[in-house]
UniProtKB/Swiss-Prot annotation:
Purpose: Facilitates protein transport into the nucleus. Interacts with various nucleoporins and with Ran-GDP. Could be part of a multicomponent system of cytosolic factors that assemble at the pore complex during nuclear import.
Sites of N-acetylserine modification: S2
Tissue specificity comment: Expressed in roots, stems, leaves and flowers, and, at low levels, in siliques.
Subcellular location: Cytoplasm; Nucleus; Nucleus envelope
Keyword terms: Acetylation, Cytoplasm, Nucleus, Protein transport, Transport
The protein's name in its UniProt record: Nuclear transport factor 2B
Species for this entry: Arabidopsis thaliana
Primary gene name: NTF2B
Length: 126
């Protein structure tokens, strides 16, 4: 397998993650594994089913993420990647967008793609 450009991989991942979140949250299940952990506004959730249950139970049906920045670094000897995202979250029917930050720790799969090992999400109230 050729060496992948971390910036290109992280950009493609971010585009896929948020377009899926905005249109079909259940479809995010394939990006997590049983060892994956989500910390959502301080609440720690582990495992695919629990993470998807949390994301699909959020109190809004429609939203649109607008990404401002994507930063990435290689992480550790297992060819993982840290991806840090900031942007705005526009909820349907709301006038003002919410600022958010999200960090993903991506780990490679044997099939040559990546899964989300860690995911930390925070709204930025400032």
């Amino acid at each position: 397998m050729s060496q992948m450009d971390p910036d290109a991989v992280s950009k493609a991942f971010v585009e896929h993650y948020y377009s899926t979140f905005d249109t079909n949250r259940v479809g995010l299940a394939g990006l997590y594994q049983e060892a994956s952990m989500l910390t959502f506004e301080g609440q720690k959730i582990q495992g695919v089913q629990s993470i998807v249950a949390k994301l699909t139970s959020l109190p809004f049906q429609q939203c649109k993420h607008h990404i401002s920045t994507v930063d990435c670094q290689p992480s550790g000897p297992a060819s993982g990647m840290l991806v840090f995202v900031s942007g705005n979250l526009q909820l349907a029917g709301e006038e003002h967008a919410l600022k958010f930050s999200q960090m993903f720790h991506l780990m490679p799969t044997p099939q040559g793609s990546f899964y989300v090992f860690n995911d930390i999400f925070r709204l930025n109230y400032a």
